[in-house]
Amino acid sequence: MEKKMLYEGKAKKVYEAEDKDHVIIYYKDDATAFNGAKKSQIDHKGILNNNITSAIFEMLHEKGIETHFEKKLNEREQLCKKVEIVPLEVIVRNVAAGSMAKRLGVSEGKELNTTIFEICYKNDELGDPLINDYHAVALGLATFDELKEIYNITSNVNNILKEFFLKQNIKLIDFKLEFGRFNGKIILADEISPDTCRFWDATTNEKLDKDRFRRDMGNVEEAYIEILNRISNAK
């Protein structure tokens, strides 16, 4: 029987699962940048991101982080808990890069005195604008208690991921997290991949992420394969 699609985003499709508490997430090869202004396809990106995200979520589970991920079903699909997505993106910045470097006039690659957490309102029509906690609560996107829990989880995930990737000679420059509500709890959702993270080789500072697509640097698929190979060797 053909699965019923519940939602299609830029990089993934969400389908009904056999029970109401789960969904099947399908990873596409579509690539977008600049809020959809730039579009293309990257060969095997969906397969690579599914494998990378599955491996990272499994590692986070071992470290006590609860996520929506249940198991990898095949090359492109995961079984995940059906969460109510909190319409926020949490951006963690360990090193100045990307839009923050441009916005604040900071040179890319500058080490920061402290890690920066930013939140954006998930709204494609508005271009996912940067907001603060008071906006989020005033607009009914989250409560202060939920934000506190989101930041606690984010801090723990950042510490785990920085250590994990550095062991693979990868610097975690910045990354985006999304969260969902499930059975009254806030849990980590979405994906963790070169689509949502900036990964630099710790020795050469070579970019191993979607910046290669954004900036027309070439070898995009090869960079994603390199990330998968390094984290696979970590197991």
Swiss-Prot record:
InterPro entries assigned to the protein according to its UniProt record, in alphabetical order: SAICAR_synt/ADE2_N, SAICAR_synt_PurC, SAICAR_synth, SAICAR_synthetase, SAICAR_synthetase_CS
GO biological process: 'de novo' IMP biosynthetic process; cobalamin biosynthetic process
UniProt pathway annotation: Purine metabolism; IMP biosynthesis via de novo pathway; 5-amino-1-(5-phospho-D-ribosyl)imidazole-4-carboxamide from 5-amino-1-(5-phospho-D-ribosyl)imidazole-4-carboxylate: step 1/2
GO molecular function, one term: phosphoribosylaminoimidazolesuccinocarboxamide synthase activity
Catalytic activity as recorded in UniProt: 5-amino-1-(5-phospho-D-ribosyl)imidazole-4-carboxylate + L-aspartate + ATP = (2S)-2-[5-amino-1-(5-phospho-beta-D-ribosyl)imidazole-4-carboxamido]succinate + ADP + phosphate + 2 H(+)
A Pfam family recorded for this sequence: SAICAR_synt
Family affiliation: Belongs to the SAICAR synthetase family.
Record protein name field: Phosphoribosylaminoimidazole-succinocarboxamide synthase
Gene this protein is translated from: purC
